[in-house]
């Protein structure tokens, strides 16, 4: 699997690995790259079955497969230890990596993630799947921004929304791959496994996330006693895209705390 590595800003710079959500594209993290690359060597990648790692995914594809193929790609690149920053599905992959490879994962940042699929999120995906079956890729792509962005933010950026729609349609991962990746997402359940996450964890969520209610991050925070939860008042599911200045400040401060504070952080900030 192909991955992209930025030049290290200094010798022995720590490595952060960015994992996108269901869309799978490494470009999702573009608003964070410039800030992160000043302090870290950054790994971005398109997930298996998407972008420049396209190809038909097998039946029974799992979250474990997603974590294992990324871990192997990192080892092949000479990266045995790293910090994970994951959004939604990417946060789940990060949890899986932290459990399966505890010596490799230095710290973990979960953005709008969850322990197990919330009933509201399941309902959203059921609606989106019906759109996919009824209207194909066009309907899926047209509906996607409604679950990602706040209404006012979208309304002020109509040309951008049209451009994003055209780009997403041109690079659509394919119905089979999408459904297999979505099934892996829906089947993931960390309620019994969270106790095996021993690395420092930062949790970031947005109160106006339409797709993943912020209560999911509250539950994740409760299951990871040493975690630090930060709540953004607005930004939607893709809060790192809609309010990158706020998000980047929270992320950089959180990373510094995770990597340099040897004691677990129990404070919840809002």
From Swiss-Prot:
PANTHER family: MONOACYLGLYCEROL LIPASE. One of its GO terms (molecular function) is hydrolase activity, acting on carbon-nitrogen (but not peptide) bonds, in linear amides. Involved in pyrimidine catabolism. May facilitate the hydrolysis of carbamate, a reaction that can also occur spontaneously. It comes from Enterobacter sp. (strain 638). The gene is rutD. This is Putative carbamate hydrolase RutD. One of its GO terms (biological process) is nitrogen utilization. InterPro entries: AB_hydrolase_1 (IPR000073), AB_hydrolase_fold (IPR029058), AB_hydrolase_sf (IPR050266), Pyrimidine_utilisation_RutD (IPR019913). It catalyses: carbamate + 2 H(+) = NH4(+) + CO2.
